[in-house]
């Protein structure tokens, strides 16, 4: 098994001109040689840490499903499935998902906040988890 890992790693390095990192992997390639050979590629999540300020009241921290339809979409929510038009989670997630070509974003906020409060000062810490990002290096200053 170790020899096969070494051979596959060397081939990937030569083909992609990238150095294989065995300790902190961005991508894991599983090769199953029992019976019919199978290759499975696992793209590990990308974690982005930051702080946000909320300068306007009326924006929830996380996406809030419509109380009537529970997120499915109805006349009351204008078929959006959302109680509120936008959230801090969506405002942060959408441009990052687009930049990374990720599959899904998961917002991890440090603490909760009411919808009618501001978040001033040094900001509220958060971690944004991007699942299956195709692009891992992005300009966060943009």
Explain the meaning of each model-derived region.
Residues 1-142:
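Catalytic/RNA-binding core of pseudouridine synthases
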